[in-house]
Amino acid sequence: MNLKNIFESTDFVHASGTKEELQVAEYLKGQCEELGVKAWIEGFRVAMGDIEEAHLYADGSQVKCRVFTCCGSGAAEGELYYMPGIDKVSIAGAKDKIVLMDVGGVGFFTYQDLVKAGAKAILFQYGNVHYPDKDIEQRDLREAVVGEEKKLLCAMINAADAVELVKNGVKNVRLEVAQKEYDGESHNVVAEIPGERDEYIVLSAHYDSTTLSHGAYDNMSGCAGLLGIMEKLRDKKLNYGLRFVFCGSEERGLLGSKAYVKAHEEELEKSALNINLDMIGTYMGKFIACVSAENKLSHYISYMAAEVGFPVSSKTGVYSSDSTPFADKGVPAVSFARIAGGNVAPIHCRYDLMDVMSMEQLEKDIEFLTLFTERFANAVVCPVSREIPEDIKKQLDEYLFRKRKEQ
């Protein structure tokens, strides 16, 4: 398999719910079929929005912005309130204000707090004041964040403009939004190599990008990893089958993996383990494993890495990727990644391009991941306990907004 061709064939923005995302899904399905592996596409609903009008005024002067899709339509006007923290005292000052935050998005509890405090709208910031570009990413107000509360108008501005608003002491802000919201569709690509047992290991990686990114590192690299493992194990006799899931819409809140575990819930008891790949194969960066399962699996990964001479930093926890919905449904899960850092391989921006990828390192990563997968696929019995530890369950509750994280 020519790994470079995978990146060249998907070297464009392919964000959730777009025709470009579907184009990549169909490409991945075709790659599986070229390897002689049966593959199919499963669609699922995603909330979408077409922005028809978006205007932001600061003391009468227009400021460039990108309105969040799915945040509703209308107008909001009020005093600008810069809120760098999310503590109770800061939240209390949001009443009747247009809130400017230091971040690019908002979690469930902070959003709920702002609505209850009486905030009129929320402004977020994107980018770096020292970068030559003045990019502004298009994001969405997630249904999981809104919950049962009302929608607040939300918009993203560039970090340089955010600094100017605060530096100039802007008083009044007005945000005007018109958009058409509708139900769209995203897709998972599923492929399967059968085993001797009626049980399988699920391997996952998301293929969607954010709205400014070509998504080479995050996460066509993980998809290339799945295809590489598939190629190496397709003709081998395995005790456990291998189910490959290329997830759509991960960047909007793990929507693809959530849709998969919901659609296949009855089958999950036959899923012995989830192996998730999210960002591998860069020139630089530390290879890590985050285990959402018993601590013994983390130790096993460290021992195996030492045995074969492949450095891995392994720990238990909950990873912000498609392993999380599996762990939440009781399937032991591990996410692997090579963390290069924003100075070397930035993500969620225009700089996530294939030139940050090392095909040589990617092949080495795939070799280790294939060996790890094959060991578990040929286990007489998968040794990983199906019981998710209590500390991991607590972290899952916090990550999935069922419990407020202790401050």
Segments predicted by a language model, with ranges:
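Second-shell loop/turn segments in exported
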Residues: 11-19, 100-104, 150-152, 177, ...
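Soluble metallo-hydrolase cores and metallopeptidase-like ectodomains found primarily
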Residues: 61-67, 71-82, 86-88, 138-216, ...
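Metal-dependent peptidase/peptidase-like ectodomains
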Residues: 198, 247-346
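N-terminal capping segment at the start of a domain
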Residues: 1-22, 35, 132-143, 208, ...
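Noncatalytic luminal/extracellular "stalk/propeptide" segments of secretory-pathway proteins
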Residues: 1-98
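His/Asp/Glu-rich mid-to-C-terminal helical/loop segments that flank catalytic regions of hydrolases
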Residues: 231, 343-407
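Extracellular/luminal Protease-associated
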Residues: 65-147, 151-153, 312
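Alpha-helical metal-binding/catalytic segments enriched in His/Glu/Asp
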Residues: 32-33, 103, 115, 189, ...
